[in-house]
Amino acid sequence: MFELVDNVPQSPVIKVIGVGGGGGNAVNHMVKSSIEGVEFICANTDAQALKNIGARTILQLGTGVTKGLGAGANPEVGRQAALEDRERIAEVLQGTNMVFITTGMGGGTGTGAAPIIAEVAKEMGILTVAVVTRPFPFEGRKRMQIADEGIRMLAESVDSLITIPNEKLLTILGKDASLLSAFAKADDVLAGAVRGISDIIKRPGMINVDFADVRTVMGEMGMAMMGTGCASGPNRAREATEAAIRNPLLEDVNLQGARGILVNITAGPDLSLGEYSDVGSIIEAFASDHAMVKVGTVIDPDMRDELHVTVVATGLGARIEKPVKVVDNTLQTAQQAYEASNPAPVRQEQPAVNYRDLERPTVMRNQAHAGAAAAAKLNPQDDLDYLDIPAFLRRQAD
């Protein structure tokens, strides 16, 4: 008798954990966006801030350290709070395949706790991606320095890192934009990235891209960029792809030489081969010759005219080796530098002057010099050799 065994693997588990006040706001935004197939967690040291969070899982950090009153903008307090609840962090991440960590850098809880959470996730073998924001310049140099140090520590434990400078919000939206709409725009970057990755992994496609492909492209890659684009009309493929790779809110990174690229195209049954080719051509333009490129397609029967493109580019910011120019750093004076570039002509040795000879008349001196020169030219041996030649030959030579 045969027994049916279900060997179909379970769908990969994706979680988003917002750390601190900024991370909690981002999680709230995504919960309202109704992103399917993703679990949300919010971690904070401030008990009051956790009361208004719509996440399914709430994780209060460091009650013994902070007494539920927050980290007081001190990253070290945030770090100690995360270390205190390290085991609880591991519990909420149990069974996770991929985790997004989001926070606003420069404060206490997010800056200090996010690197610890990333460290725990990496130790558990979870594909870890961080999406963080940098402070506004007017928030002060001290806060910016704290943020930079936090990003540096976070980068050591995550597979891929996406940075959004708040300053870009002013540039793109203008000073008249409301504060709520500005931060919602930044949260849209994270929401778009999470939704795009979720669609790539969980929605089967005609040309399928699975979680193993995502891990290959995003694992241990460092600086990353994620973008989504949507367009309709005759040039929808090109317009959607260009919108996905030109997100104005992301940190200024050079897309040239990306080492890993993941692309997902979602469209209706009218997706053409030419459109598929257009997307690939644009992607090829900024990929390095040795890049790992994965392009998948999902055909959605409910879509009409619209085409969605999700692009994940990783391994960005690699330095291009330039020819090495050898420079002599030896200190030189201005006179030495001039003499080195303008060498003086070689002076020939002049014979010593015989002042006694100058007492003789010029005519006699010239005759003496002429006689000496003629005598120097005459060689007695030459005359003897000349006589050895037979006379008839000497006459012919003369």
Curated annotation (Swiss-Prot):
Q: What does the entry list as the binding residues for GTP?
A: G21, G22, G23, G24, N25, G108, T109, G110, E139, R143, D187
Annotated Gene3D superfamilies: Tubulin/FtsZ, C-terminal domain (3.30.1330.20), Tubulin/FtsZ, GTPase domain (3.40.50.1440)
Q: Name one GO molecular function term.
A: GTP binding
SUPFAM superfamilies membership: Tubulin C-terminal domain-like, Tubulin nucleotide-binding domain-like
* GO biological process terms, semicolon-separated: division septum assembly; FtsZ-dependent cytokinesis; protein polymerization
Q: Which InterPro entries match?
A: Cell_div_FtsZ, Cell_div_FtsZ_CS, FtsZ/CetZ, FtsZ_C, Tub_FtsZ_C, Tubulin/FtsZ-like_C, Tubulin/FtsZ_2-layer-sand-dom, Tubulin/FtsZ_GTPase_sf
Q: Which Pfam families match?
A: FtsZ_C, Tubulin
- Out of the domains of life, which is the source? Bacteria
Compartment(s) where it occurs, according to its Swiss-Prot or TrEMBL record? Cytoplasm
Keywords attached to this entry: Cell cycle, Cell division, Cytoplasm, GTP-binding, Nucleotide-binding, Septation
Q: Name one GO cellular component term.
A: cell division site
This protein's major location comes to cytoplasm
Family under the similarity heading = Belongs to the FtsZ family.
What is the recorded function of this protein according to its Swiss-Prot or TrEMBL entry?
Answer: Essential cell division protein that forms a contractile ring structure (Z ring) at the future cell division site. The regulation of the ring assembly controls the timing and the location of cell division. One of the functions of the FtsZ ring is to recruit other cell division proteins to the septum to produce a new cell wall between the dividing cells. Binds GTP and shows GTPase activity.
Give the HAMAP family listed for this entry.
Answer: FtsZ
UniProt subunit comment: Homodimer. Polymerizes to form a dynamic ring structure in a strictly GTP-dependent manner. Interacts directly with several other division proteins.
Protein name (Swiss-Prot/TrEMBL): Cell division protein FtsZ
